[in-house]
UniProtKB/Swiss-Prot annotation:
Name of the encoding gene: bioB
Organism name: Acinetobacter baumannii (strain SDF)
Name the UniProt record assigns to this protein: Biotin synthase
Keyword Iron-sulfur: yes
NCBIfam families with a match to the protein in the record: bioB
Catalytic activity: (4R,5S)-dethiobiotin + (sulfur carrier)-SH + 2 reduced [2Fe-2S]-[ferredoxin] + 2 S-adenosyl-L-methionine = (sulfur carrier)-H + biotin + 2 5'-deoxyadenosine + 2 L-methionine + 2 oxidized [2Fe-2S]-[ferredoxin]
One of the GO BP terms on file: biotin biosynthetic process
Binding locations of [2Fe-2S] cluster: 97, 128, 188, 260
């Protein structure tokens, strides 16, 4: 399938409106054109600083604006992070993602995160961080330290965005993605479904992602996990079939991207997840927790992989890895 960055909303809507089985069949065909069948990229996500975030994202337990009963934690020691990364690698994860509840990293935090990137990279894992907004200098320093991916989700459509967040703009998010690209890192960016948005908004989110100059290498499709104390605690749950439709459309319009199952997966049955894989999802977060929300544990994931005949993808060597190998040869 030809890679395109000029998808129209009307084309994306037409995909959504296909009969479900036709849509999933098409998505699986596209998936097999560009990826190895029955192989899933596995990532582990660790919170390196939890809670007291100044942003007001209405879905988030870490926001200081809401009483979610979350116990805030200061930055954890680099040694603890490395220990967790080693355990993740031993459990089959090829990528280790580190997240901090910041609006943006302060300069005093940069030596801390840069050391962390270098140490995790030395383990032979792909590295990813989500630290909030970045400026160009910070993006370049993260790249120089060995960061492979930077996550910064768009969350929802531009139209619906102001219903969810007021403390940073949609364009703030796009600017950070631009800095990440300019620095030479790979982009991880997706969104959350089930925020009370309409299908039109889900179309809008995918349209924004699929018309970026370069598609994100990873596209997380989160399902809202309602958290007591947040404004979205009682929002009506999105139908799983609609979530899978979103995954299938994302696969078709961004054929080279990894489509990741992220938050909300712990509430899904094995059959739901199998359908999501059939619809083109080929990445997931493993482990008992995603930052502050529960997640399917590693044991459950391995049991599911065994049941479905899936295997975990091995880390891909980066340009810097190949350069080191050449120097040592």
């Amino acid at each position: 399938m030809t890679l395109r960055n000029d998808w129209t909303r009307e084309e994306i809507q037409a995909l959504y409106e296909q009969p479900f089985l036709d849509l999933v069949f098409k998505a699986q065909q596209v998936h097999r054109e560009h990826f190895t069948a029955n192989t899933i990229q596995v990532s582990t996500l660790l919170s390196i600083k939890t809670g007291k975030c100044p942003e007001d994202c209405k879905y988030c337990s870490q926001s200081a604006h809401y009483d979610s009963k979350l116990e805030a934690e200061k930055r954890i020691a680099v040694e603890k992070v490395i220990s967790e990364a080693k355990a993740a690698k031993d459990s089959g994860s090829s990528r280790f993602c580190m997240g901090a509840a910041w609006r943006n990293p302060h300069e005093r935090d940069m030596p801390y995160v840069l050391e962390m990137v270098r140490e995790v990279k030395a383990l032979g894992m792909e590295t990813c961080m989500t630290l909030g907004m970045l400026n160009q200098s910070q993006a370049e320093r993260l790249k120089d330290a060995g960061l492979d991916y930077y996550n910064h989700n768009l969350d929802t459509s531009r139209k619906y965005y102001s219903h969810i967040i007021s403390t940073r703009t949609f364009d703030d998010r796009l600017n950070t993605l631009d800095y990440v690209r300019q620095a030479g890192m790979k982009v991880c960016s997706g969104g959350i479904v089930g925020l009370g948005e309409s299908r039109e908004d889900r179309i809008g989110l995918l349209h924004e992602l699929a018309t970026l100059p370069i598609h994100p290498e990873s596209v997380p499709i989160n399902m809202l996990v309602p958290i007591e104390g947040t404004p979205l605690a009682d929002v009506e749950k999105l139908d799983v079939i609609e979530w899978i439709r979103t995954i299938a459309v994302a696969r078709i319009i961004m054929p080279h991207s990894y489509i990741r199952l992220s938050a909300g997966r712990e509430s899904l049955s094995d059959s739901d997840q199998a359908l999501a894989f059939m619809a083109g999802a080929n990445s997931l977060f493993s482990g008992d927790k995603l930052l502050t929300t529960p997640n399917a544990g590693e044991g459950k994931d391995q049991a599911l992989f065994n049941k479905l005949g899936l295997t975990a993808e091995k880390p891909k060597p980066t340009v810097s890895d190949l350069s080191v190998d050449a120097m040592s040869a």
